[in-house]
Amino acid sequence: MGIKYLPVSVASTALSFVGLQVWTELSLDRLRADGLIAKNISLGDSEHALELLLGSYFTIALLTNFVLNVYILLVLSLKTLFFGDLYDVETKKLVERLANYIIYKGTFLPLVIPPTIFQGVLWTVWLTVLCTLKMFQALARDRLERLNASPSSTPWTYFRVYSVLFLVLSVDMFWIKLSLMTYNTIGSAVYLLLLFEPCSIAFETLQALLIHGFQLLDMWINHLAVKNSDCQRSKFIDSMTAGSLLEWKGLLNRNLGFFLDMATLVMALGHYLHIWWLHGIAFHLVDAVLFLNIRALLSAILKRIKGYIKLRIALGALHAALPDATSEELRAYDDECAICREPMAKAKRLHCNHLFHLGCLRSWLDQGLNEVYSCPTCRKPLFVGRTENEVNPRTVEVSSDEQLARQLERQNNPVHALATGLFPAEVPDSVENDTSRNLGLDPSWLQTWSSQGSDVAGPSTTSRTVGLGRVQMMMRHLASVGESYAQTALDDAAWSLWPMNPSQASTSSTTVPPGNGGRTGGLHLRTVSNTTNESLTNILAMAETVREVMPHVPDEIIFQDLQRTNSVAVTVNNLLQM
């Protein structure tokens, strides 16, 4: 599908048009010679002449060939205009996705469609249009992701690819209108199937427009600031937009993205439910496949809802842990964020009265080592007046961690492998019986803001007994999940019969670098003493961090996931989807 195919497509389309025209003239001359039509065809005789022409299979073949060539020419022209040459990875992914879509969406249509020529042509055109829309949507999303990661991309290049999403949405809305008119005209329940997939594509396209629209806006603002650095109007625009762009981006991506994500899943579920209702239950193999697909979609919907609820709880905890700066403070300081050097429409205030964007502060705390978190400006500790036990309330569990380390070491030694499991059975009653663990929050979090509510920020001089590890890890999780939640929700699941397991989607997109001591890939603990001790130390430290954020998750599940992923962020992502 490279640019070199475009001249070939133009020549093929021209030849097919000439061949169709020549054959039509010869057919009309033969019909005139037989006396079936008059020499001068009037408007009233045109319908009869067209019926006679379409009575020939060769005419239908030439017409089909011409339409197919026009379609290929149109696709290649749009591809050349918006994308240029495709990368090898894009071409490979495109072929795989289209094959999956045709198999999983077109296979079930013969079960409910009457075997007539009209029905065959109608549903073939329907599937072709949907495949084309999905193809351009997927190409646009993949290319936008590549441009977003490229430092040399310009706003114009980004907008050229971004406009493909508007084209897809416009054609899809027009197709939905035609499908609705067809259903209203014929009135058969079969034609409701014309609506589910176009609506699903519309929701997916709106989701992509939302996510990449913020990226385009951010790129345009940065480009404008660099180009017109001395222009007062540019500075005014920056002060009005840059400060609140991050807040609006996270809010809309999280809430509106979740709604569009759920709408896409519901449309896919409705498509298969309607096919099952039209086909009936006959206890055949196809019924089992439909049932498994419906079950997987229902499971994905429930997991998405549970993940969104957990994310909302985490956001409330984070906003309570770090108080918001008031409008009076923002006007009094009239400062910009010391991390991103952008104006602040909303900010979080530390106890030292320095203000920062929540996202910037989240990234700063993500760099903290050994729970030594300081203000980016004055380097004062973020939370003062706290004892060592308050900073790390789980240090009393060192004995259990030592037991875990010893059992992990035995497990990695084939001579001392344990058949009964990896983790100790002894768990403190105070941890297991704490009801607040069922909510995913530690009691030390709840005690400090239960009387204020999650959105009320205390004074800057008030010290809060908030676990720094929990704040840091919660910020890391919200950075990796909250902002990209809507974007990665249906990237590959919408193409397959069964949606991808969220844990598989997370781990498959994460590359774990080789560790020290010859470890490659995932976490493989060796029997060598130095490597084993280092690996045990790392996994215990990561388990402690995950345990601070999600104390309600059993230790066994945390350690098993960490051994598979060797990443705290990926493990938190996986546990949130449970």
UniProtKB/Swiss-Prot annotation:
Molecular-function GO terms, alphabetical: ubiquitin binding; ubiquitin-protein transferase activity; zinc ion binding
Pathway(s) where this gene product acts: Protein modification; protein ubiquitination
Bilayer-spanning residue ranges: 6-26, 58-78, 111-131, 161-181, 186-206, 272-292
Sequence segments annotated as region (Disordered): 504-524
Matching Pfam families: CUE (PF02845), zf-RING_2 (PF13639)
Residue spans, zinc finger RING-type: 337-379
EC number: 2.3.2.27
Residues of the CUE domain: 538-578
Subcellular compartments: Membrane
Assembly with partners or alone: Interacts (via C-terminus) with RPM1 (via N-terminus).
Job description of the protein: E3 ubiquitin protein ligase that acts as a positive regulator of RPM1- and RPS2-dependent hypersensitive response (HR), in association with RIN3. Probably not required for RPM1 degradation during HR.
Protein name, UniProt field: E3 ubiquitin protein ligase RIN2
